[in-house]
């Protein structure tokens, strides 16, 4: 009998998933337990940053956990199989170290460089295509979650994807909240028509929405602060060098696990560089480029949410939330970021 991923998860994840959807849709298990989806359980949502002491997090929340959680949120609010599956599949093309590959592809700002592979991966999966045929669902109804506004929409609106990674990062990865607060936030959400007459998630209560903005504004800075930008670019540059030296193919990044690539790095000439980063406690910054030192100087995707409270953006009705959003958006990314011991020549 085939293993069931949902039976293997720990109690913290079970409790979280149960908040998102108390009545788990059993039909979803067949899709979760396909080879292509199960591969995602070995990829961290932290884009590899979890492997460095620069970050405090020890909770491994996988790309698969995120996909399941997004699917549960969509199912909770829509009870629509096609939309739910589009959410489950939205990161099926996620490679090792997640968005680090976008940094390899020089896609710092949109971080969408891998999404073109989604259709191809689903189409080439005999398991998934058989299930879709069984359920009378067309590939083009589930391979693009941008089609469904509850699944995904444009910043600064609230969608299932944006909501999920905010909740799980706050709860598990960066410990900015606890399970009771997550439950309070989630249970305050409803679906309304936004200013464009399109369905969007909204809060019922201004106070809860303000708490959510406080959390997401802090997270948004974490996603692009010095240690994060440095870590993602360093890992991307190491992988790029491994690729140039034929030690790792681009295909490997979609087939291997995070730990497999780490093992390859440890057996390469980049071992010392990786271990300096792995054991580092704090990055250094400079307004000018440090001489002969490997440094990172780039912007990154700005993730922020200005949610609706009933039918109005919170920034229009709450000065505290407006200031939190403005502070988040004004975060300075002009500095050069570096670590002692890693030279420019090492990665050029």
Q: Would you name each region that the model predicts?
A:
Residues 83-91:
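Short alpha-helical catalytic segment bearing the HExxH-like zincin motif
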Residues 2-82, 96, 100-348:
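Histidine-centered, transition-metal-coordinating active-site segments
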């Amino acid at each position: 009998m085939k293993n069931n991923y949902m039976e293997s998860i720990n109690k913290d994840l079970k409790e979280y998933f149960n908040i998102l959807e108390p009545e788990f849709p059993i039909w979803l298990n067949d899709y979760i337990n396909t080879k292509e989806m199960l591969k995602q359980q070995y990829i961290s949502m932290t884009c590899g940053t979890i492997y460095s002491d620069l970050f405090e997090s020890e909770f491994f929340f996988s790309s698969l956990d995120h996909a399941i959680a997004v699917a549960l949120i969509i199912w909770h609010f829509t009870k629509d199989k096609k939309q739910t599956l589009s959410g489950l599949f939205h990161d099926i093309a996620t490679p090792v170290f997640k968005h680090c590959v976008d940094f390899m592809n020089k896609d710092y700002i949109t971080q969408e460089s891998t999404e073109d592979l989604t259709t191809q991966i689903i189409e080439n999966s005999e398991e998934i295509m058989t299930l879709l045929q069984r359920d009378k669902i067309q590939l083009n109804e589930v391979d693009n979650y941008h089609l469904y506004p509850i699944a995904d929409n444009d910043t600064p609106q609230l969608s299932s994807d944006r909501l999920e990674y905010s909740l799980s990062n706050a709860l598990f990865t960066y410990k900015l909240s606890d399970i009771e607060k997550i439950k309070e936030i989630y249970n305050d959400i409803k679906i309304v028509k936004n200013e464009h007459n399109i369905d969007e998630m909204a809060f019922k209560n201004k106070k809860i929405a303000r708490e959510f903005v406080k959390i997401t504004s802090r997270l948004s800075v974490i996603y692009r602060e010095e240690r994060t930008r440095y870590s993602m670019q360093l890992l991307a540059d190491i992988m790029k060098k491994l690729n140039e030296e034929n030690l790792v193919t681009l295909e490997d990044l979609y087939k291997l696990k995070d730990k497999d690539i780490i093992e390859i790095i440890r057996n390469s000439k980049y071992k010392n560089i990786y271990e300096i980063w792995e054991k580092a406690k704090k990055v250094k910054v400079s307004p000018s480029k440090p001489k002969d030192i490997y440094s990172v100087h780039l912007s990154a995707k700005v993730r922020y949410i200005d949610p609706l409270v009933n039918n109005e953006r919170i920034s229009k009705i709450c000065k505290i939330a407006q200031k939190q959003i403005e502070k988040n958006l004004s975060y300075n990314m002009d500095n050069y970021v570096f670590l002692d011991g890693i030279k420019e020549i090492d990665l050029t």
